[in-house]
């Protein structure tokens, strides 16, 4: 034992050991694999747990900034790969591992492969929204690609039959897990595609599972076949938190098989309710239109021109009388003027006593009077002819003239005009209107012209 030993403080010793760790290049970046132990998730905080194998364990700290970058959710007992460094925690004098990265053991390569394939297919446009097809409103036949023995097909059939029993569901069995799963899924999709337009929509799916279990739905061949389908495809793979490339390329994604069936089918009860509502709205609109037309008809029926058709000619007759009066007055004025002129000439002739000139003027006077009378008579005749033609045209379009040719119009007991047999009933009393009176009749039978043989 040394004569003068140097006693270190606990802090000094811990600091010394810490410096040893920091100066050791092998401890600057350490890669470990092991099983998560004592893992209790702390939200918005640093994570403290252990990493163990079958012989020993080490305490691990993962600061919040590193933990929030993880692309998966660590769980107790999960085997993981971690990287970081070793250091001493001075206050407790214990060394521990400070983790900076973590990924599931055995899945790191799969995640990297998945990331690269997703980037490749995204660049090709397989996930673009403009390629997505609309789901049919009323599918007649639905094809389902899934395991024949799982609960997926049962949930889909139960939900679809409850919502829309009209739709037929055909199962195309496929392995949904394992090395052969991708090939069987592609084969079933191609078989559906070969049916042409037999199916309106396709549902592809399986229950939840690990990344390895769901891997067939990340296979490139499966993704490309879904993209090539002519009909819409609904993907229901895994749980809501799981996302596969099949989900990204499909036209719609459902969190569960039940949700997939709901996407694919309408709710018949909702459809029937909507039909009833639309039917009521249509009936109300038709009734409103009929009421409006009846109001117009009533106004026309009460119009003075139909109540007293002869009033149509009143203005024309008055105009003819006025023109006749003006014509007669013009003729009278002209004759009076001519007589005055003749008398004036006679006076002048008497003063001059020109015999021959007088005779010539008399002949001119007689000619002028005759020509004027003839012109006025022709003008009056032409005006009367125009008046007669106008009155004839008005008479031709008169409702009374139509009745005069043998036509009648029919009204019911309320005085409404009957225009169709659709609303008539047997033994209903009607009134026929002739030009000179009315006749009351009873309906004995009804014959519709549209089918020629239906009688009521």
From Swiss-Prot:
Pfam families: Exonuc_VII_L, tRNA_anti_2. Its EC number is 3.1.11.6. One of its GO terms (molecular function) is nucleic acid binding. One of its GO terms (cellular component) is cytoplasm. It is found in: Cytoplasm. InterPro entries: Exonuc_VII_L, Exonuc_VII_lsu_C, OB-fold_nuc-bd_dom. CDD domains: ExoVII_LU_OBF (cd04489). It comes from the Bacteria. It catalyses: Exonucleolytic cleavage in either 5'- to 3'- or 3'- to 5'-direction to yield nucleoside 5'-phosphates. Its main location: cytoplasm. Belongs to the XseA family. Bidirectionally degrades single-stranded DNA into large acid-insoluble oligonucleotides, which are then degraded further into small acid-soluble oligonucleotides. NCBIfam families: xseA (TIGR00237). Heterooligomer composed of large and small subunits. This is Exodeoxyribonuclease 7 large subunit. The lineage of its organism: Bacteria, Bacillati, Bacillota, Bacilli, Lactobacillales.
């Amino acid at each position: 034992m040394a004569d003068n030993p140097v006693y270190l403080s606990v802090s000094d010793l811990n600091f010394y050991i810490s410096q040893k760790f920091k100066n050791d290049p092998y401890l600057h970046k350490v890669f470990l694999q092991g099983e998560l132990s004592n893992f209790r998730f702390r939200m918005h905080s640093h994570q403290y747990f252990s990493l163990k194998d079958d012989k020993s364990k080490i305490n691990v700290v993962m600061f919040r900034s590193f933990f929030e970058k993880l692309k998966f959710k660590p769980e107790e007992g999960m085997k993981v790969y971690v990287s970081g460094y070793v250091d001493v925690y001075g206050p407790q004098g214990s060394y521990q591992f400070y983790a900076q990265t973590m990924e599931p053991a055995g899945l790191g390569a799969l995640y990297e492969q998945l990331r690269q394939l997703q980037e490749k297919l995204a660049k090709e446009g397989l996930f673009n929204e403009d390629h997505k097809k609309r789901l049919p409103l009323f599918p007649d036949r639905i094809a389902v690609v899934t395991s024949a023995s799982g609960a997926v097909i049962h949930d889909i059939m139960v939900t679809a039959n409850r919502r829309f029993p009209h739709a037929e569901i055909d199962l195309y069995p496929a392995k949904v897990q394992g090395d052969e799963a991708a090939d069987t899924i592609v084969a079933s999709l191609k078989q559906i595609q070969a049916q042409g337009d037999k199916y309106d929509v396709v549902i592809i799916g399986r229950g939840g599972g690990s990344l390895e279990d769901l891997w067939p739905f990340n296979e490139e061949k499966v993704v490309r076949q879904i993209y090539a389908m002519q009909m819409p495809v609904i993907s229901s793979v895994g749980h809501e938190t799981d996302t596969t490339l099949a989900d990204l390329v499909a036209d719609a994604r459902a969190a569960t098989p039940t949700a997939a069936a709901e996407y694919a089918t309408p709710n018949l009860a909702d459809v029937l309710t909507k039909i009833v509502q639309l039917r009521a709205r249509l009936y109300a609109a038709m009734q409103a239109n009929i009421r409006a037309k009846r109001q117009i008809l009533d106004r026309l029926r009460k119009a003075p021109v139909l109540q007293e058709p002869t009033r149509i000619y009143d203005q024309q007759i008055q105009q003819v009388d006025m023109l006749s009066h003006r014509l007669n007055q013009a003729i009278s004025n002209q004759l009076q003027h001519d007589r005055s002129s003749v008398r004036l000439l006679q006076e002048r002739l008497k003063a001059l006593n020109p015999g021959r000139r007088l005779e010539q003027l008399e002949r001119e006077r007689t000619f002028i009077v005759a020509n004027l009378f003839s012109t006025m008579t022709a003008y009056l005749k032409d005006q009367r002819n125009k008046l007669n033609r106008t009155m004839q045209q008005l008479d031709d379009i008169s409702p009374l003239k139509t009745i005069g040719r043998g036509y009648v119009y029919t009204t019911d007991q309320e005085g409404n005009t009957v225009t169709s047999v659709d609303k008539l009933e047997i033994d209903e009393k009607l009134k026929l209107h002739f030009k000179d009176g009315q006749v009351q009749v009873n309906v004995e039978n009804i014959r519709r012209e549209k089918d020629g043989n239906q009688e009521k």
